[in-house]
Amino acid sequence: MTAKRILIICLFISMLFCLPSKAQKPGDIVSEQTIRQLGEKHFFSISPIPDEIFHLMQGKTYKKNCTVARSELRYLRCLHVDKDGRKIVGEMVVNKAIAADVLDILKKLYEAKYPIERMRLIDYWDANDERAMRANNSSSFNFRFISHTHTVSKHGKGLAIDINTLYNPYHKRLKNGKDVVEPATARPYLDRSKHHVYMIKKGDLCYRLFKAKGFRWGGDWKHSKD
């Protein structure tokens, strides 16, 4: 083997090592080197719902009685940072009307290293809110009607966003005095005077960014908290 051939082979091998690893999937931790090589913009995108994602949603978030057209929804990809500083690929399905605003918010949260533990499609939990919330997942679209009505909920349209759901639970006190907490494992986090890195506090960055885009915060609701 000539020296020239050896040099070409060595250059080829070195190029292979310099290339980023296979395409990053939602939930994957991404190295700083990969982000530098590909650029942050590579990880932030809005697209129509891809076929493989729409197939995953069938019978889960996109139920048989879903009245929201596929064309009304958008698939977001982003990066988010967990409490340990790891940079993770996230994904979310939202209504196209808010897609650009939500991606802008998620990018700003990432840049500020605002901690978000998990951001996967709730379809991986079979669209079961309780299970996904126990996993502290952040998500949006999950088709459903408001209880005892024919009105599609905000989540059912992909117009509501839940962030760090275990530490920011839904809480309502019924007239009989019973407390409804979702997820049920979130009772320790009802006391909002306590601090946890995944708690959203009124006035913090997550609160301010969503409010600036016209979102209402569930923590401000009078008859329930979300």
Residue ranges and their predicted role:
Residues 1-8:
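Bacterial N-terminal signal peptides that target proteins for export
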Residues 8-17:
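Bacterial N-terminal signal peptides
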Residues 19-23:
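Sec/Tat signal peptide C-region and signal peptidase I cleavage site
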Residues 24-81:
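N-terminal module-boundary/linker segments of secreted carbohydrate-active enzymes
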Residues 68-133:
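Active-site acidic/histidine clusters and adjacent loop/turn architecture
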Residues 69-72, 152-158, 209:
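Extracellular/periplasmic catalytic domains that process cell-envelope and extracellular macromolecules
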Residues 116-117, 131-166:
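Mid-length scaffold segments of soluble, non-membrane domains
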Residues 146-148, 161-226:
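Catalytic cores and adjacent binding grooves of peptidoglycan-active enzymes
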